[in-house]
Amino acid sequence: MRVFITLSFISMLISCQVNYSFTGGQFSGAQNFSVNYLKPQTALASPAYCQQLTEGLKDYLLAQSPLKLVTQNGDLQYEGSIVEYSVVPIAAQGNEVASLSRLSITVKIKYTNQLEKELNFEKTFTKYADFPAGQDLFSVQADLWSAINDQLIQEIYNSSVGNW
């Protein structure tokens, strides 16, 4: 009888399984993903920026998920475009001159989950970064792009597979 109880207990322990993910990703059984080049739909969005955002999204998905990157027709598919790229003054000084400017970028993303169609979406994501108005945009552009991309990519990930 003790052998039976011991074997039953060991069997229960072995059959217990806990799945935990530090990234919170839910991949619906997907094995791979594809990211199409995010196209500029506004005159100010440079192809270099679009390429940087596209590659950043690929890199983030590779680092944060068990999925493999494929060139097209992935189980999870990302495509989209840059629909707004603007610089506006945001903080006026006493002499009616702006002390800060804001670079704002809006991306429209179409996410397709080939395995669970009800998770598909098309959304816009907007993020921005501020910089001193006296600085030339081109001198701070790389840092602004990096800061904005980090936020955009995190939000796209959370909306698609992060269950947020």
Question: Which residues make up each language-model segment?
Answer:
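Short hydrophobic/aromatic-rich motifs at helix boundaries and adjacent loops
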Residues: 9-10, 25-31, 79-82, 128-129
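A structural "domain/chain start" motif
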Residues: 14-59, 64-67, 71, 115, ...
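Surface-exposed short loop/turn segments
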Residues: 63-68, 75-120, 128-139, 150
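Short, small-residue-rich loop/turn micro-motifs
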Residues: 37-39, 125-129
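Second-shell loop/turn segments in exported
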Residues: 40-46, 135-143
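Sec-dependent bacterial lipoprotein signal peptides
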Residues: 1-16
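Compositionally biased, intrinsically disordered linkers/stalks adjacent to structured regions
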Residues: 141-164
